[in-house]
Amino acid sequence: MAVPFRRTSKTVKRKRRTHYKLSAPNLVVCPITKNFTLPHRVTKNSGYYKDKLYLANKKID
């Protein structure tokens, strides 16, 4: 089994870990409900995408 020849220093570890980060999601405002949603997706609340209804909200009485 391979063993590292030298110990990895703190700076080398930290420089490598600077690329391990999350990016913030792009959010757009739904023109119908004014809620934030992901772009190019049907909104969960209204069911609209590009001014067309794709999901009908089912109400249980």
From Swiss-Prot:
Signal sequence span is none
**InterPro entries, from UniProt?**
Ribosomal_bL32, Ribosomal_bL32_bact, Ribosomal_zn-bd
Whether RNA-binding counts among this entry's keywords is no
Its Gene Ontology cellular component terms are: large ribosomal subunit
Which terms in the Gene Ontology molecular function aspect does this entry carry?
structural constituent of ribosome
Q: Which branch of life, at top level?
A: Bacteria
Pfam families from the UniProt entry: Ribosomal_L32p (PF01783)
Gene Ontology BP term (one): translation
Q: Which UniProt keywords apply?
A: Ribonucleoprotein, Ribosomal protein
User: Into which family does the record put it?
Assistant: Belongs to the bacterial ribosomal protein bL32 family.
Record's protein name? Large ribosomal subunit protein bL32
Q: Which organism is it from?
A: Phytoplasma mali (strain AT)
